[in-house]
Curated annotation (Swiss-Prot):
This is Nicastrin. It is a single-pass type I membrane protein. Gene3D superfamilies: Zn peptidases. Residues 17-678 are extracellular. Keywords: Glycoprotein, Membrane, Notch signaling pathway, Signal, Transmembrane, Transmembrane helix. The gene is aph-2. The keyword Ribonucleoprotein does not apply. Component of the gamma-secretase complex, a complex probably composed of the presenilin homodimer (sel-12, hop-1 or spe-4), nicastrin (aph-2), aph-1 and pen-2.
Length: 723
């Protein structure tokens, strides 16, 4: 009986694991490099790991023809393998004619996305590759909520959209990971080539190279469920007894928005209720997304338009006395707004409109402090927005207005449009003007404010008419290879649009538009274009390195902190808001009144513990010289959360006209590469182990003490005699 017990214990203790558990390479995957769960009010989207999609044999899809192997589950190449696959796939093969195969495949665990290295130029029309919908932000469209249109009536992105609702609104059954590290990609490719690549006759055999990856989301369902779980009374039941903390399962998408006031109006107890002014808001969105949200540079979707606005702001900042004098006389002002989250149902502008309605924009007001005077929706005359600059077909631009509101204030609006046209024509660009009362505004920040006020007018300047010309709006592939001619034309467009912004703004506030006021700095435009667009990272150029001055630190192992990304995210782990904030301070900040301030500590004290809180003081270097100075500016950087999903919003003020996008908190693991052996190999190893154990027991059982060599002195020592 004892012998059989020994046998059982020995066999149970033997590790009979095959090669499938022998990981030979681990690749670190940072936050933002993989697909995860996102939510709106009614649905969940994105990816979730489960037992069916974690492991798989690595295969390649290098060209269109390779998708036929996906349809057959690669049976002709791996006839003895019955598991699932991880497919290496270049991003440019995500197309209209391939997306359905990826969605419906039953043999994929996931896809490993990477940039193919093929050059894509801004005017390339060969591939529809927008990851956004045919009707971007259709659910938040002013005309839909005003019951003037049906859902997605104007398919403005029909040329570029891969799917009707966009790739971010797909609930995938597979996982996705994006590999941007060339060394990691080479390791995966080498593993495939050594073990999985079929021979010339098409055959292959064990062992194979396998891959495992897991991203586990903490939340599921929709944003309504997520919102309820985020409330304090719900967190009480989730609290960790040891730490006292309630785990966050999901949260609203939010990040910094930037508002700059060249000529701010102060508040005070005596004038807070009587001052009224009119405003032109000049705006550009600062966010984009891809099918893996963070992988989104947004060159044309975001960056070129922002450069146009920054150049106009810089020109205004160098002549600020003239603008201040004109604003004081006309009681009209211009301010700049960079909204974040606009590609996801207008998160930033929706929150700003809500705050305006409640008297909290741009700052919370305290009676014992002087702030920038609150702006109300009815004080906005115009929202001048620019989009998709740098990719015009020929030299033609379009201005988009709301037809009904245009007819109500045609004379003044025509004057603004006329100044825009003059600015464009000074650089040999043409402008197509509004056609009539039936005009509708394309997706733009104006939609948020149109719901809050019946008179605010859109003046949207863009290089498209009824449909987007650029076919990669909000896409991983919104990253171009610019030839010298394409780069020069884009810079010319940015210069022309920036001049048009200045011309319209100057006429609105009553500034005499002489050559000095209307001139923009083309050299600065060229420099920022090369830094933000052609450089690999925001701080790779000399201009941005000097502007940084050692202030930027990569605090997180996230894609947005280590690569160029314009996605809004939930935790603000992206560098771009910081980059844009510093550039805006450079454009509008001044050290004329702070020349005697010689340290960062002294500079920061200027804005602290004072009753006058209208200005901020920033210790920042000059991007041309690298020398630090204390810059005074009326620039507000604030995190904006959609009122519909903000846990701080009172229940009675909740309004579903705002964005409901949220994200799940997730746990991301590394990619593991391992060797896969045939199941028969596993059984063979178990059999060998069992036989070895039995032979060992049989051999040991036949032994006695005389079988072993014993030191003759041991018995004497046991008897107490010395050795």
């Amino acid at each position: 009986m004892k012998k059989w017990l020994v046998i059982v214990l020995i066999i149970a203790g033997i590790r009979c694991d095959g090669f499938s558990d022998q990981v030979f390479r681990t690749l670190f995957i940072g936050e933002g490099n993989a697909c995860y769960r996102t939510f709106n009010k009614t649905h969940e989207f994105g990816c979730q790991a489960n037992r069916e999609n974690e492991n798989g044999l690595i295969v390649r899809i290098d060209k269109q023809e390779d998708f036929k192997n996906l349809d057959s589950c690669w049976n002709s190449f791996y006839p003895k393998y019955s598991g699932k696959y991880w497919a290496l796939l270049p991003v440019n093969l995500i197309r209209r004619d391939t997306i359905s195969q990826l969605k419906s495949s039953k043999c994929l665990s996931g896809i490993v996305l990477y940039n193919s290295g093929e050059s894509i130029h801004p005017g390339d029309e060969s591939t529809a590759a927008s990851h956004d919908a045919e009707c971007p932000n259709a659910a938040s469209d002013y005309y839909l909520q005003d019951k003037n249109e049906e859902y997605c009536e104007r398919k403005i992105n029909s040329r570029g959209a891969i799917t009707r609702d966009g790739l971010m609104k797909i609930d995938w059954r597979i996982q996705m990971v994006f590999i941007d590290n060339s060394t990691d990609l080479e390791i995966i490719e080498k593993c495939y080539s050594m073990f999985n690549k079929p021979k010339e006759d098409g055959s292959s055999g064990y062992p194979y190279c396998g891959m495992s990856f897991r991203l586990a989301n903490m939340a599921a369902g929709n944003s309504e469920i997520c919102y309820r779980r985020g409330k304090n009374d719900a967190k009480l039941f989730q609290m960790n007894i040891d730490s006292g903390d309630a785990p966050q399962l999901c949260g609203a998408m939010h990040s910094d928005n930037i508002f700059a006031f060249p000529t701010p109006i102060p508040t005070s107890p005596t004038n807070e209720t009587i001052i009224t002014s009119k405003y032109m808001m000049v705006t550009a969105r600062m966010d984009s997304f891809g099918m893996i949200p963070e992988i989104s540079v947004g060159e044309v979707s975001v960056l070129t338009s922002i450069i146009s606005v920054l150049a106009a702001a810089r020109s205004m900042g160098t002549q600020i006395e003239k603008w201040q004098k004109a604003s004081n006389t006309s009681n009209r002002n211009v301010f700049f707004a960079f909204f974040n989250g606009e590609s996801l149902d207008y998160i930033g502008s929706g929150a700003a409109a809500y705050q305006m309605e409640n008297g909290k924009f741009p700052q919370m007001i305290r009676s014992d402090r002087t702030h920038i005077h609150p702006i109300r929706p009815n004080e906005l005359d115009y929202i001048l927005e620019v989009q998709q600059i740098g990719v015009a077909k020929g030299r033609k631009y379009y201005v988009h207005v709301d037809g009904e509101r245009y007819q109500q204030n045609k004379t003044q609006t025509d004057r603004v449009i006329d100044r825009i046209e003059r600015g464009l024509r000074s650089h040999a660009f043409d402008l197509e003007k509004p056609s009539g009362s039936g005009d509708r505004v394309p997706p733009a920040s104006w939609h948020s404010f149109a719901k809050a006020d019946a008179h605010v007018q859109s003046v949207l300047l863009a290089p498209y008419g009824k449909e987007y010309e650029y076919q990669r709006v909000n896409s991983i592939l919104d990253k171009n290879e610019w030839t010298e001619d394409e780069r020069e034309k884009a810079i010319q467009e940015i210069e022309a649009v920036s001049t048009a912004i200045l011309a319209a703004a100057a006429d609105y506030v009553g500034v005499e538009t002489d050559e000095v006021v209307a001139k923009v700095d083309k050299k600065l435009i060229t420099t920022i274009f090369d830094c933000l667009i052609t450089s690999n990272f925001w701080f790779d150029c000399d201009f941005m390195q000097k502007l940084d001055g050692g202030r930027y630190h990569k605090l997180f192992n996230s894609y947005g902190f280590n690569q160029k990304s314009t996605y809004i995210s939930m935790e603000s782990h992206t560098a771009f808001p910081t980059v844009l904030h510093w550039l805006t301070i450079f454009a509008l900040g001044s050290d004329k009144e702070t020349l005697n301030v010689k340290s960062e500590k002294s500079c920061s004290h200027l804005g602290q513990f004072q009753a006058f809180q209208m200005y901020t003081y920033t210790w920042q270097p000059n991007p041309y010289t690298g020398n630090f100075s204390c810059l005074k500016s009326a620039i507000v950087k604030k995190v904006m959360v959609s009122p519909a999903v903000d846990s701080q919003t009172p229940e009675e003020e909740m309004n579903t006209r705002y964005s409901t996008w949220m994200e799940s908190v997730y746990i991301i693991e590394s990619v593991n590469l391992y060797l896969m052996e045939d199941a028969s190999f596993e059984y063979t190893m178990i059999l060998i182990a069992v036989i070895s154990a039995l032979l060992s027991i049989f051999a040991v059982g036949r032994c006695s003490e005389t079988t072993f060599i014993v030191d003759e002195g041991e018995p004497a020592a046991e008897g107490g005699e010395p050795l």
